[in-house]
């Protein structure tokens, strides 16, 4: 129980510290288009930590952007079952991150290059504020704090799908389901 309380406390401290430094969750309108945009001091977005990847530092043909892009190797695609799962909630904004090449294979379009660069120069998001919210929701569920679990889950679920209906009581399965869609 001690570790669960500490996990929730750590997640909440990370959220408060991030938001105090102007990091914020992307809103529903921003979410599909913000990948690959440059953060600024005034608007750092929700990526808390990312690996900067340019062809100067690494061979671009092995970058996440190149591996996951239909314009690259096309090595990483989503499963058919995950695609059909996302289609069950057609108003979920995260569906807009999917790109298809030939209607047979779907790619996740999260590894975008910075403006003016090519797909080989896509940075790799490691930790996002949304993941921290989901960590807090999971720790709250495991700690029996239904109010905090609902608070953190709601922020991510409604951002992803404005038609989302919050369950009467948030369960671990609810949090894991949202994590599956978000990350």
Positions of predicted regions on the chain:
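Acidic/polar-rich alpha-helix caps and helix-coil junctions
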Residues: 1-64, 74-77, 87-183
């Amino acid at each position: 129980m001690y570790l669960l309380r500490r996990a929730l406390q750590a997640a909440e401290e990370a959220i408060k510290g991030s938001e105090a430094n102007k990091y914020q969750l992307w809103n529903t309108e921003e979410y599909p288009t913000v990948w690959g945009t440059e953060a600024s001091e005034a608007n750092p977005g929700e990526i808390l930590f990312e690996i900067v990847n340019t062809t100067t530092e690494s061979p671009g043909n092995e970058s996440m952007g190149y591996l996951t892009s239909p314009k690259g190797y096309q090595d990483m695609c989503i499963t058919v079952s995950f695609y059909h799962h996302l289609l069950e909630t057609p108003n979920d904004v995260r569906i807009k991150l999917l790109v298809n090449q030939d209607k047979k294979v779907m790619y996740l379009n999260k590894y975008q290059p910075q403006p003016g660069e090519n797909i080989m120069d896509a940075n790799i998001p490691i930790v996002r504020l949304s993941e921290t919210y989901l960590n807090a929701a999971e720790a709250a569920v495991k700690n029996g704090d239904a109010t905090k679990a609902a608070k953190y889950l709601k922020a991510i679920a409604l951002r992803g799908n404005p038609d989302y209906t919050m369950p009467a009581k948030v369960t671990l399965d609810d949090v894991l389901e949202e994590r599956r869609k978000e990350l």
